[in-house]
């Protein structure tokens, strides 16, 4: 996905001190952010001009100790054609030499009201999510008790109908039919809907419904971390399904592994309640309580007692 300086300005509500339409349309190609401290003393080895340049209180205070000519020289070297923008934090005053060098080199100058660390964190979070490589998977993503559950299965097995029932039970729809997944970092997988399918759910026999319009803003989310995969499968008498919770199946998406639970589907079974229970049980395991282990311990104790008798 392409992220422009204008998109960053709109997302973080930054003030444009200098920058025309062309400069604000510049693409940001990396989520890495540079604080040009060493560059201000003339050290440009390993300098990355393609990064956003963030000036905080430390850099600003040091600039005040320099002469006007030195300040201009520093910014003339920092600002390159490939530099997307420079952001000054805390609403600090923009040095005239910075503006002059920015105009000469075609670099937008932005100003934020937040602290430097807060601004840096917000920019990194936004850019990492927007610039991450995406993969589209078939399924439905639902937020169940704050946990992202990816529901997969054959076409027509009832994924969307199950998601609708979960929404009616107070959970939140993230994406239907196509889920765009991406890794925000090494161990965190996120999912979001395609823009054209935002808040929409397709129900066979009914058509497309707008979940936000019908059930309100509390029934939808624009994105969610993906923590569990539920695979719906047609029930077959000769098929073996996990009955104790011993299964350790996983799927890998974008290099991130998440647990997978296979659930058989047959007439009369309330799949949405089963998925809800599976999500709660998984969360309980994450918190240290394992019902399967409890059952095994009780069974072992019972066998021991019977053996003694």
From Swiss-Prot:
GO molecular function, one term: protein serine/threonine kinase activity
Its EC number(s): 2.7.11.-, 2.7.4.-
Entries under Gene3D superfamilies matching the protein: HprK N-terminal domain-like (3.40.1390.20), P-loop containing nucleotide triphosphate hydrolases (3.40.50.300)
Binding site for ATP: 153-160
Region (Important for the catalytic mechanism of dephosphorylation): 264-269
Highest taxon of the lineage: Bacteria
Catalytic site positions: 138, 159, 177 (proton acceptor), 243
Single GO BP term: regulation of carbohydrate metabolic process
InterPro entries with a match to the protein in the record: HPr(Ser)_kin/Pase, Hpr_kin/Pase_C, Hpr_kin/Pase_Hpr_N, P-loop_NTPase, Ser_kin/Pase_Hpr-like_N_sf
Cofactor(s) needed: Mg(2+)
The UniProt record lists the keyword Protein biosynthesis: no
Cited Pfam families: Hpr_kinase_C, Hpr_kinase_N
Binding site for Mg(2+): 160, 202
Region (Important for the catalytic mechanism of both phosphorylation and dephosphorylation): 201-210
Swiss-Prot/TrEMBL keywords: ATP-binding, Carbohydrate metabolism, Kinase, Magnesium, Metal-binding, Multifunctional enzyme, Nucleotide-binding, Serine/threonine-protein kinase, Transferase
Recorded catalytic activity of this chain's protein: [HPr protein]-L-serine + ATP = [HPr protein]-O-phospho-L-serine + ADP + H(+); [HPr protein]-O-phospho-L-serine + phosphate + H(+) = [HPr protein]-L-serine + diphosphate
Domain notes: The Walker A ATP-binding motif also binds Pi and PPi.
Function: Catalyzes the ATP- as well as the pyrophosphate-dependent phosphorylation of a specific serine residue in HPr, a phosphocarrier protein of the phosphoenolpyruvate-dependent sugar phosphotransferase system (PTS). HprK/P also catalyzes the pyrophosphate-producing, inorganic phosphate-dependent dephosphorylation (phosphorolysis) of seryl-phosphorylated HPr (P-Ser-HPr).
Something else known: Both phosphorylation and phosphorolysis are carried out by the same active site and suggest a common mechanism for both reactions.
Protein family according to the UniProt entry: Belongs to the HPrK/P family.
Subunit structure: Homohexamer.
UniProt protein name: HPr kinase/phosphorylase
Organism: Streptococcus thermophilus (strain ATCC BAA-250 / LMG 18311)
Encoding gene (name): hprK
């Amino acid at each position: 996905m392409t992220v422009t300086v204008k998109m960053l300005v709109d997302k973080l509500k930054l003030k444009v001190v200098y920058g025309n339409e062309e400069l604000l349309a510049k693409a940001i190609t990396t989520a890495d952010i540079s604080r040009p401290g060493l560059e201000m003393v003339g050290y440009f080895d390993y300098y990355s001009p393609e990064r956003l340049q963030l000036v905080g209180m430390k850099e600003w205070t040091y600039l005040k100790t320099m002469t006007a000519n030195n300040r201009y020289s520093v910014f003339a070297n920092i600002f390159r054609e490939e530099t997307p923008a420079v952001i000054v934090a805390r609403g600090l005053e923009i040095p005239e030499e910075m503006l002059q060098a920015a105009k000469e080199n075609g670099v937008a100058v932005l100003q934020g009201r937040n602290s430097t660390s807060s601004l840096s964190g917000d920019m990194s979070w936004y850019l990492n999510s927007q610039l991450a490589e995406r993969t589209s998977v078939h399924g439905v993503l639902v937020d169940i008790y704050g946990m992202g559950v990816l529901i997969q299965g054959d076409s027509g097995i009832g994924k969307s109908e199950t998601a609708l029932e979960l929404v009616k039970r107070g959970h939140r729809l993230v994406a239907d039919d196509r889920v765009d997944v991406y890794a925000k970092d090494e161990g965190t997988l996120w999912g979001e809907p395609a823009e054209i399918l935002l808040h929409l759910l397709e129900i066979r026999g009914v058509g497309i419904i707008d979940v936000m319009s019908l059930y309100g803003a509390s029934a939808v989310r624009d994105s969610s971390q993906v923590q569990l995969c539920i695979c719906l499968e047609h029930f077959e008498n000769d098929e073996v399904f996990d009955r104790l919770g011993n299964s350790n199946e996983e799927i890998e998406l974008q290099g991130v592994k998440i647990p997978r639970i296979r659930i058989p589907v047959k007439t009369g079974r309330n799949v949405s309640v089963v998925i809800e229970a599976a999500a709660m049980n998984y969360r309980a395991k994450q918190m240290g309580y394992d019902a399967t282990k409890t059952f095994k311990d009780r069974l072992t104790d019972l066998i021991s007692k019977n053996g003694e008798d």
